[in-house]
């Protein structure tokens, strides 16, 4: 989930408000930076439009925001992200998660069917009083096209029917569901995976 995190009182309520602000766009060369710059681009914003562009990882970005060294930062990660949780519970600090879900169609038009719109539910972070629409890209489990169909079927089945084991390792895995598993793929589904989804009555999006 793409997060755009701003400090309450910074004057940042929309992506357009990032112009002229100090923004961390993610570590150099990271997925966060690539996706974050594409979100900004969808709104007609380039790094030159920012007062300053810091290129920090999420922990460093969170620290810089708390220290008022930046006005906002971009982060792409699961829900909830520990560093964002930490800021949200810091005494005297209130954050805003900036909506930008309407960037997804523009990103798809330019870069292909890698992105879609999803929601960070209210209450994910302290102070979030409503759902926030954001642009997201999925993580993919990729197999060679020559993998045997029964094996691909069993892998898909085991993965999706044992998500509780994954959640025990990483809370972000709670977002993995039958419906979410078929969203945002830019490559064809393996026949073995398709057989499992068909058994479960899950339709594959046209994209």
Feature map (PLM): residue ranges:
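C-terminal lobe and pocket-closing loops
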Residues: 89, 94-154, 196, 204
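Glycine-rich, charged/polar anion/phosphate-binding loops
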Residues: 59-60, 80-83, 125-128
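Structural recognition of the beta-strand scaffold that forms the well-ordered cores
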Residues: 3-5, 24-25, 72-76, 96
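A ligand-binding cleft/hinge motif common to bilobed small-molecule-binding domains
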Residues: 37-44, 66, 72-95, 102-117
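Bilobed "Venus flytrap"/periplasmic-binding protein-like clamshell domains
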Residues: 1-67, 164, 179, 183, ...
